[in-house]
């Protein structure tokens, strides 16, 4: 927490795990995991400690796009006498040291795909842009408006290969239905859920001006955060089903009868609602892990979509682009003999040019 109220000084001291202590604890875990992991959670570090889940591995994966924002923690959970594996990644680092515009989203998504992930549940604190979405309410967004500024790398398809994937529906409706059902099942236990909404993703790290906040309301925006993009776009490019769960922590700065958003306000509501958030995410993971959803979490509806979205013929890919694409989609692109022949000719030309 960046800000602290004076009253918090009088509260009992709670020991916080230091970076060295956390690193030491995670170092004890195995650094490999053999089986594919289909489901992942991206969120804050608090969600790594889910009730009923046991940490069994901590993976440090290097990608062509760099290092992910945290090690990927593999969690085991028993559901209906079956052990289910779930991957967890801390979006802003293990100690929330990575700013929204610094999150290595490409490395995060690529690393998750490399261990078999095909469905991502993303969790985020958001500001509410509508009166009916109160602080501590949950929202399952179905649309997003991109207000980032191009500072964040936002595509896998560049530097020698061009691709365009559909993004009309940025979230996966099949996964969203499960999330909504789980949320409504917990409404008697403190969870208040809004089934749909338009998410505004802003650049940050500063909060909105009052004029911006009112503008987003006039556009029909429901909630606002700094985390959804390019995460959701990259997941689509990687053929991964993606659904975000939003937890409202404030009314941004448009509301005339409440205080403007502060970090202290955000963190306070997140802490107060932490139990509900964990129960919600746990319920979703339990449902996704059920045998009847085994096909759904493999996101087969997206399989092969990249092949149809690429505009650059394989023969014309740069060597660097080919290496990146084969890392992200191993065995995915078959190179026929004619293309191999062209590549060999090109290689020979390049070699003779040095003589």
UniProtKB/Swiss-Prot annotation:
Key word Nucleus present: yes
UniProt keyword Transport, yes or no: no
Annotated phosphate binding sites: 45, 91-92, 124-125, 227
Swiss-Prot/TrEMBL keywords: Cytoplasm, Glycosyltransferase, Nucleus, Purine salvage, Transferase
Gene Ontology biological process: glutamate biosynthetic process; L-methionine salvage from methylthioadenosine; purine ribonucleoside salvage
Catalysed reactions listed for this entry: S-methyl-5'-thioadenosine + phosphate = 5-(methylsulfanyl)-alpha-D-ribose 1-phosphate + adenine
UniProt subcellular location: Cytoplasm; Nucleus
Residues the record lists as binding substrate: 226, 250-252
Residues flagged as site, Important for substrate specificity: 208, 263
EC number: 2.4.2.28
GO cellular component terms listed in the entry, alphabetical order: cytosol; extracellular region; nucleus
Gene Ontology molecular function, alphabetical: mRNA binding; S-methyl-5-thioadenosine phosphorylase activity
Gene3D superfamilies linked: Nucleoside phosphorylase domain (3.40.50.1580)
Role played: Catalyzes the reversible phosphorylation of S-methyl-5'-thioadenosine (MTA) to adenine and 5-methylthioribose-1-phosphate. Involved in the breakdown of MTA, a major by-product of polyamine biosynthesis. Responsible for the first step in the methionine salvage pathway after MTA has been generated from S-adenosylmethionine. Has broad substrate specificity with 6-aminopurine nucleosides as preferred substrates.
Subunit structure: Homotrimer.
Family to which the UniProt record says this protein belongs: Belongs to the PNP/MTAP phosphorylase family. MTAP subfamily.
Descriptive protein name: S-methyl-5'-thioadenosine phosphorylase
């Amino acid at each position: 927490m960046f800000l602290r109220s004076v009253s918090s000084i009088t509260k009992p001291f709670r020991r916080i795990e230091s970076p060295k202590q956390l690193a030491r604890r995670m170092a004890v875990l195995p650094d490999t995991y053999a089986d594919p992991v289909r489901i992942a959670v991206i969120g804050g570090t608090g969600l790594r400690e889910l009730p009923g889940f046991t940490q069994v591995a901590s993976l440090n994966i290097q990608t062509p796009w760099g290092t992910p924002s945290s090690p990927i923690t593999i969690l085991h959970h028993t559901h209906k006498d079956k052990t289910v594996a779930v991957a967890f990644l801390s979006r802003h680092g293990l100690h929330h040291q990575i700013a929204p515009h610094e999150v290595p989203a490409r490395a995060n998504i690529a690393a998750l795909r490399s261990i078999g992930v095909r469905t991502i549940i993303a969790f985020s604190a958001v500001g509410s842009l509508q009166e009916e979405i109160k602080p501590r309410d949950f929202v399952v967004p179905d649309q997003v408006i991109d207000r980032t500024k191009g500072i964040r790398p936002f595509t896998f398809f560049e530097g020698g290969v061009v691709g365009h994937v559909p993004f009309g529906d940025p979230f996966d409706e099949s996964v969203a239905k499960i999330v909504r059902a789980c949320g409504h099942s917990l409404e008697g236990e403190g969870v208040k859920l809004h089934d749909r909404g338009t998410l505004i993703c802003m650049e940050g790290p500063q909060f909105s001006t009052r004029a911006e906040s009112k503008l987003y309301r006039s556009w029909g925006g429901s909630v606002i955060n700094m985390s959804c993009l390019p995460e959701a776009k990259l997941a689509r490019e990687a053929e991964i089903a993606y659904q975000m769960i939003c937890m409202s922590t404030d009314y941004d700065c448009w509301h005339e009868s409440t205080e403007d958003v502060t970090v202290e306000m955000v963190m306070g509501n997140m802490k107060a609602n932490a139990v509900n958030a964990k129960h919600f995410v746990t319920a979703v993971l339990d449902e996704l892990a059920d045998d009847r959803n085994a096909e759904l979490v493999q996101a087969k509806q997206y399989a092969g979509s990249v092949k149809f979205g690429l505009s650059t013929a394989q023969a014309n890919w740069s060597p660097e682009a080919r290496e990146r694409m084969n890392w992200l989609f191993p065995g995915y692109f078959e190179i026929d003999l004619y293309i191999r022949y062209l590549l060999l000719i090109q290689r020979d030309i390049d070699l003779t040019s040095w003589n």
